[in-house]
């Protein structure tokens, strides 16, 4: 019965035709291709450039730019288009120069005794060509075990200990010749495993040893989120692989014929490959750049990047003086060889030396490692084997001879301990103490200077206040009630913060034509905004606090200090401020296209915004918020994101403005609590509006509302349908599969892809979910907007579409009643903006 079953499947697979599979009796001729099941990869014949030579390989099927990831006959091209791919009589997948099968070009070369008569060749969606038996499911050969120059996700680099399989990358000869080049990236078999890029037989660049999360020579290698790195070192194999958690992300790593290694990601919007990271990129990356027992210190070097390790001196001082480091360093002549008083100097942020000759013990601690090194006179240095593992620093690496290819990094690397005698140890300790004394002396001097400057400023401000009482203003305006004690404290703050440029009141009056009504651009929550022109013809916008402004000195100082410290393409740029004669004013760059609400909430102007422009505005706002939340020196929560606070320059680039209510978070602080709720009805997250609780997810909520308003051209709080607001209406349509009905009908349908708009609506709904923990963060939003992501999570019920109970566990944040206006205005405790 078993024999009949095998024969049945044998004949079935001979005559079954599949787009991703070559059957035993089928052939693939030049001009024909097979596609993987998801049509991500193609396998067939190809040529490069204007060449007539034909190769058989694998490439991306959905990318317009030809990108080859694997070549079968890389060193044996076919001269014309008469080639053919088919199974040989003995069962190997083979490439022939012609259909008469007389000239064999390439073969999978599996032992005949292993092959089965039911073999097929299948191309997977990972880009892996697999020779396997569909009856037993056994795999006999796969292209992932024989890579060329490209390292794809879920491929493995390394070697197996039993059968000797070596998976390494070999560069092309040139851009137009995929033949085997000189550059080879392989896993070292000697010592502690590491990846080294060779040029011929000479080490060119060292990827380093595994740290527990990444390779020591690639500090920019990402950890987690989209990319997952994995390293295996056991009795069967030593290998490295990486995967992607988002199937829409297309990425590859390759060895270039020029001697560099690159990680590329595909940017579908721009139809191009983005260079995610590349190495080597500086002198310190070159293998053994500073010779034996030297290390490269490029980040802190002003003249020569090479330094001898502690206890060593240049082997050839004259060459070293002439910036020739090839001779490296040797042990200092007077240094004792082995003594009970030996110690270790710790070097921080190091790429540890080549581990080919290092000994390793993964079962001892770093403290035990130090003791063992001291007891062994041949031990010259030690370090943790995995310093970034989930269990912390584990394992012990020891060096017993010359140390090659060490360097420092600015914000990465690990601790490296060099053995020195007692004299050298005392010298390093003295240098460390003298450095601390210098820092202490500098701090004392700075404090004294600040105190002296404060006293001087106190005298200057007091004299200015006296003179101001007797001086009348040339401007005809109504002054705002103002606390002079606050003004004085602001003057003190100016002395401590040199990033606050100051404008003279007369300069502002002249620039705005005495605050002429013709120069008035509009009025915000804290007062009118005027256009001005300085004497150098520079156009400015002046925000002048009105008499009824709820913004006090703290909010005023907050906005000035925050914006002066922030620099980003999508944040409004402050030019300075003016605090004089009871006036408080902010001076900004002038943006001619006003604010976003002028465009999206007015039919005539909204018609000018096609889909590409709206998407660029959305992406710009997202990048600006991400900068505030994650990439700036300060973690900042804006708390008042809305359409009127998004300004547009002459090129319609969005700029986030109005930081009066922003809050600074500490590096590890995730959320805050306030008894004074400020913001704009319709844009505030529920936990903030009702409980006084705010976090970066509060801004995410506001962004989601703003994004949905941009897509629909409708205002959230002014939307009157059966649902309570625009968000609720969109949710109802989304639930019923009718969300396309809400797309702004003023947009030309030819300018947008309906699937992309639906994706953006889904992202907006992911931002406005009721529970803050369910909302995506801004880094995820930026990635979703930048990639053709298709597997987005399903949004949960948004906020403010049904009754929500106020208070709860964190309701104590609000100690007083919060006034809320149904109009689209910002509000505070008891008064509207």
UniProtKB/Swiss-Prot annotation:
ATP binds at residues 521-529, 543. Disulfide bonds join 284-296, 290-306, 308-329, 369-396, 373-379. Residues 515-800 form the Protein kinase domain. Residues 338-421 form the PAN domain. This is G-type lectin S-receptor-like serine/threonine-protein kinase RKS1. Gene3D superfamilies: Bulb-type lectin domain, Phosphorylase Kinase, domain 1, Transferase(Phosphotransferase) domain 1. SMART domains: B_lectin (SM00108), PAN_AP (SM00473), S_TKc (SM00220). The chain crosses the membrane at residues 441-461. Its main location: membrane. It comes from Arabidopsis thaliana. Residues 462-833 are cytoplasmic. It is found in: Cell membrane. GO terms for molecular function: ATP binding; calmodulin binding; carbohydrate binding; protein serine kinase activity; protein serine/threonine kinase activity; ubiquitin protein ligase binding. The keyword DNA-binding does not apply. One of its GO terms (biological process) is recognition of pollen. Pfam families: B_lectin, PAN_2, PK_Tyr_Ser-Thr, S_locus_glycop. It is an enzyme of class 2 (transferase). Residues 19-440 are extracellular. PANTHER family: G-TYPE LECTIN S-RECEPTOR-LIKE SERINE_THREONINE-PROTEIN KINASE RKS1, RECEPTOR-LIKE SERINE/THREONINE-PROTEIN KINASE SD1-8. Residues 604-621 are annotated as: CaM-binding.
């Amino acid at each position: 019965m078993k024999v009949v079953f095998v024969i049945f499947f044998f004949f079935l697979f001979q005559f079954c035709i599949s787009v991703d599979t070559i059957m035993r009796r089928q052939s693939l001729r030049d001009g024909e291709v097979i596609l993987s099941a998801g049509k991500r990869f193609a396998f067939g014949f190809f040529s490069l450039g204007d060449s007539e030579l034909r190769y058989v390989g694998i490439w991306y099927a959905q990318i317009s730019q030809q990108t080859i990831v694997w070549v079968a006959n890389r060193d044996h091209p076919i001269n014309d288009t008469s080639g053919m791919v088919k199974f040989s009589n003995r069962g190997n997948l083979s490439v022939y120069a012609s259909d008469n099968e007389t000239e064999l070009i390439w073969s999978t070369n599996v032992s005949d005794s292993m092959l089965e008569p039911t073999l097929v060749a299948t191309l997977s969606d990972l880009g892996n060509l697999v020779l396997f038996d569909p009856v037993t499911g056994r795999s006999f050969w796969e292209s992932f075990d024989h890579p060329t120059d490209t390292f794809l996700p879920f491929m493995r680099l390394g070697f197996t200990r039993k059968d000797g399989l070596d998976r390494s990358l070999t560069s092309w000869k040139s851009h137009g010749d995929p033949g085997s080049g000189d550059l080879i990236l392989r896993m070292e078999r000697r010592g502690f495993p590491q990846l080294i890029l060779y040029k011929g037989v000479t080490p060119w660049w060292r990827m380093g040893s595994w740290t527990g999360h990444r390779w020591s020579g690639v500090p920019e290698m990402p950890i987690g989120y989209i990319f997952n790195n994995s390293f295996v070192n056991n009795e069967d194999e030593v290998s490295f692989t990486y995967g992607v958690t988002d199937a829409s992300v297309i990425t590859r790593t390759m060895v270039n014929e020029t001697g560099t290694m690159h990680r590329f990601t595909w940017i579908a919007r721009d139809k191009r490959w983005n260079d995610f990271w590349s190495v080597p990129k500086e002198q310190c990356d070159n293998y053994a750049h500073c010779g034996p027992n030297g290390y490269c210190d490029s980040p802190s070097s002003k003249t020569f990047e090479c330094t001898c390790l502690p206890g060593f001196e240049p082997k050839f001082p004259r060459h070293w003086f002439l910036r020739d480091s090839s001779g490296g360093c040797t042990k200092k002549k007077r240094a004792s060889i082995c003594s009970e008083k030996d110690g270790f100097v710790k070097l921080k942020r190091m790429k540890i030396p080549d581990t080919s000759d290092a000994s390793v013990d993964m079962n001892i601690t770093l403290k035990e490692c130090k003791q063992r090194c001291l007891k062994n006179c041949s031990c010259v240095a030690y370090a943790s084997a995995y310093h970034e593992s989930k269990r912390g620093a584990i394992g012990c690496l020891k060096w017993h001879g010359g140390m090659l290819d060490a360097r420092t990094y600015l914000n990465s690397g690990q601790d490296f301990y060099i053995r020195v005698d007692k004299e050298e140890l005392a010298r390093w300790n003295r240098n460390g103490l003298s450095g601390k004394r210098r820092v202490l002396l500098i701090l004392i001097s700075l404090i004294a200077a600040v105190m002296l400057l404060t006293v001087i400023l106190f005298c200057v401000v007091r004299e200015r206040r006296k003179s101001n009482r007797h001086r009348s203003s040339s401007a005809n305006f109504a002054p705002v009630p103002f606390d002079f004690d606050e003004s004085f404290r602001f003057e003190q703050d100016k002395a401590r913060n040199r990033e606050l440029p100051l404008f003279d009141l007369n300069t502002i009056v002249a620039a705005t034509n005495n605050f002429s009504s013709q120069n008035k651009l509009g009025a915000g929550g804290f007062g009118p905004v005027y256009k001005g022109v300085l004497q150098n013809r520079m156009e400015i916008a002046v925000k002048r606090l009105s008499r009824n402004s709820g913004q006090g000195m703290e909010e005023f100082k907050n906005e000035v200090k925050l914006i002066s410290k922030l620099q980003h393409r999508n944040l409004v740029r402050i030019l300075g401020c003016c605090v004089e004669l009871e006036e408080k004013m902010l001076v900004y760059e002038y943006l001619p296209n006003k604010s976003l609400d002028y465009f999206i909430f007015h039919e005539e102007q909204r018609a000018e915004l096609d889909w590409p422009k709206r998407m660029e505005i959305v992406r710009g706002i997202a990048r600006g918020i991400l900068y505030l939340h994650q990439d700036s020196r300060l973690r900042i929560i804006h708390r008042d994101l809305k359409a009127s606070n998004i300004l547009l320059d002459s090129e319609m680039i969005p700029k986030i403005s109005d930081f009066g209510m922003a809050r600074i978070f500490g590096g590890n602080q995730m959320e805050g609590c306030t008894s004074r709720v400020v913001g704009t009805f319709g844009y505030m997250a529920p936990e903030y509006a009702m409980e006084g609780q705010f976090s970066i997810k509060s801004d995410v909520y506001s962004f989601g509302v703003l994004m949905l308003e941009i897509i629909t051209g409708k205002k959230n709080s002014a939307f009157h349908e059966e649902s309570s607001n625009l968000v609720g209406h969109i949710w109802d349509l989304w639930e019923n599969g009718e969300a396309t009905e809400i797309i702004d009908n003023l947009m030309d349908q030819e300018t947008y892809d309906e699937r992309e708009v639906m994706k953006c609506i889904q992202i907006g709904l992911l931002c406005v979910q009721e529970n803050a923990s369910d909302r995506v963060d801004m880094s995820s939003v930026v990635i979703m907007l930048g990639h053709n992501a298709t597997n987005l999570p399903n949004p949960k019920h948004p906020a403010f579409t049904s009754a929500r109970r106020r208070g709860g566990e964190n309701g104590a944040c609000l100690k007083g009643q919060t006034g809320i206006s149904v109009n689209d205005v910002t509000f505070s405790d008891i008064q509207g903006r």
